[in-house]
Amino acid sequence: EAIDVVPCETIDIEVPARSEFIIEGQFLPNRDITIGPHSNPIGYYDDEQLFPLMEVQCITHRDEPIWYSTMEMMPPFDHNYMAVLPIEGELLSDLQTKIPEVNDVVVTPNLSYFVQLSVDGAQKPHPEFGKYVLHAVWGASGRWGRTAKIVVVVGPDVNPYDLNEVEWAILTRVQPQSDTIINQSGQAFLMDPSAPKDSSHG
């Protein structure tokens, strides 16, 4: 169904008539502004950064508009929960096309990745199947797999949405020397303050 559109006030384009706000303006070449320091979604402050300057010419809105905004702070908060949804969907879709035994993917507000399988230890295709899934996460299309810092693979009896259950499974089913992998070729998440300064970022 088509949506109603209306013309802008200062620009020759049409916009959805029921938009909360329409901000009209222009970006001028070689006009930047310094922003920061400011908080980011992982609980740290970013340094000052240069961004293109937008000259606002007009602001219009519908009746009783709602202004959407987030306050960046220590996770968890609303930005984190909104941000992980597309990551979960992207990874789940990619993994299930390659590994039918992948049942679900959960990404926590702190960007830990929990992958739930539909098979338990007795049913898995081969003894190292969990590690195979780990490598599939790091090799997934898009940038989120290769920047995954912590990935945990659990069986069908562990609820990946319950951090206590995941921690219990790690405590009772994992031996670090044989059941963990350090990904030496992984990329650092762009905002990770612990990443080496010369590392590649995703």
Regions found by a protein language model. Name each.
Residues 1-202:
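Charged, compositionally biased interaction regions
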